[in-house]
Amino acid sequence: STSVLQADKKEITIINKNENTTLTQTIAPIFEKYLMEILPQRSDTLDKQELNLKSDRKEKEFPRIKLNGQCYFPGRPQNRIVCRHIAAQYINDIYQNVDYKPHQDDYSSAEKFLTHFNKKCKNQTLALVSSRPEGRCVAACGDFGLVMKAYFDKMESNGISVMAAILLVDNHALTVRLRIKNTTEGCTHYVVSVYDPNVTNDKIRIMSESKENIKHYSLMDFMNVDYSLLKWSNDHVINQSVAIIPALPKEQLLMLKGSVDEITPPLSPATMNLLMAIGQNHQLTQLMIQLQKMPELHRTEMLTAYNSINLPGLYLAINYGNADIVETIFNSLSETGYEGLLSKKNLMHILEAKDKNGFSGLFLAISRKDKNVVTSILNALPKLAATHHLDNEQVYKFLSAKNRTSSHVLYHVMANGDADMLKIVLNALPLLIRTCHLTKEQVLDLLKAKDFYGCPGLYLAMQNGHSDIVKVILEALPSLAQEINISASDIVDLLTAKSLARDTGLFMAMQRGHMNVINTIFNALPTLFNTFKFDKKNMKPLLLANNSNEYPGLFSAIQHKQQNVVETVYLALSDHARLFGFTAEDIMDFWQHKAPQKYSAFELAFEFGHRVIAELILNTLNKMAESFGFTDNPRYIAEKNYMEALLKKASPHTVR
């Protein structure tokens, strides 16, 4: 029978009449009404209300949290919480409270939990797994008790009475709490409590007076699931593996070193998945050698190591920042022992490690700005490609790391201004070009990094003022030119960053006054001249920066009163005109260049009433005429007189 005592304190007492024992459990207030619905028959006694379980229990809705990595509080489906975050919060609460018990009230409702739940908690599990504490291991779920016994041995010898750990089973996170409890009668109890956030944060506890008894328990003994979850339990708890990541203060973690070295997990995809996730590099290295003896189908299954939501093990390793795991996978596959053991299709499937949304592991690493993982992948790729005879198209496809919308991964890097990550990728390209025979078209396509709509990443970088992105590309071009034949026109096409829309990247930079972007390009002009044989034909498009309607970015800068931009453009022409072979006629052609509206730059400035800019254009022309010695040029004299005459007039709108 079941009874409820002191209803205002939300406690239930479970009475086992056969063994004459009782167990009191505090429940969260939000679950009280569900308990009342499940057990609705009460007596009239106020101090002791007896409840009987109805036979139609299966027809009732229980406050369950689904095993898909997310939980929903009943009645409030918009309040979604990721279950592993709750598991991490449990551990956090354990160490923040003297009694080592989470405050039940913090978990009593969606509102209270969200108040209690801080922003750092999202990274709490990631930080715990990524820190790879001593004593972590992957074991068969049936050996769960064996691991607990090993922990108890270390705890007892080091005088520690309480520890906790996160458990990863498939895509599901739980927490376990171990406690050595000395009773007043002089007995020692070893208590293992597993908290399962997917089952309303209840716990299942097993207590024993002997450590030897603990080791006989499997993880399934601690699972509290209803009928709808039995298949998941049978698939992933009974016959699979569990990763156990201890959560102890740093000064105590060292005591777990060597505690589970003798635990050997079963050879299965689930084991591989968890080994990659928690960073067990030593065990993984040994398994990679064993895999060479397997048939290809089983070998591929082991190396992809999917969990039940189709996340590959390599993807999880990248997600948790396990660069050494990534390096082990790539380097092991690069060894001659693996040559010919995998088809190219299966190999690329393993290396790409895509999630269900089509995002590859490389895409994830670059998006997370994980330089170590990206460096490990790029460093290992040339040898791996040589071992398995990958062609340039396969390597190009891997490097572009397109998602389902066909956007290049470098598009997001450039758009977000992540210059450091871009530099890592571009620095790896020369070796990849040599070893994998990437073509000029493939390399330029990587540099343009267009999205699904054909918009280059450099367009977004220039539009947003990310001059560091432009600088990294300009600095990488000379070394790339040593490997492939990049022409001056290719560079102009790259730097103007034309999109399928009306504008170009350089046009937008001038319009918005991003001086850092413009200066970066113009400062690189001498290098472009020396390396790519730039001439005046190549320089003029950069100075004008026309959009698709042939409207110059210089004119747009004038229209938007970007005086610094205008001054920089004319100064760049003045500084580099001789280097690029400009003649007096070329200079006058530039000054008299007209937009589709039939205005020159000076006329446009005058038309919009920007007198300061108009005077700047005139003064720059006069200085260049003196410097280049064409003060007697008829075109110059006529243009000078025309501009001076306009400036003397009080009102605009008198343009010829």
Predicted regions and their residues:
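Ankyrin repeat domain, specifically the short helix-to-loop turn at the C-terminus of the second helix
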Residues: 289-301, 330-349, 378-397, 426-445, ...
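Ankyrin repeat boundary/linker residues
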Residues: 306-307, 354-355, 402-404, 450-451, ...
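Cysteine-dependent deubiquitinase/ubiquitin-like isopeptidase catalytic cores across multiple families
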Residues: 16-198, 203-263
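Ankyrin-repeat helical register
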Residues: 277-278, 317, 365, 413, ...
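Conserved hydrophobic residue in the first alpha-helix
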Residues: 274-275, 314, 362, 410, ...
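Ankyrin-repeat intra-repeat helix-capping/turn positions
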Residues: 281-282, 321, 369, 417, ...
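Conserved ankyrin/ankyrin-like repeat signature
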Residues: 286, 324-325, 372-373, 420-421, ...
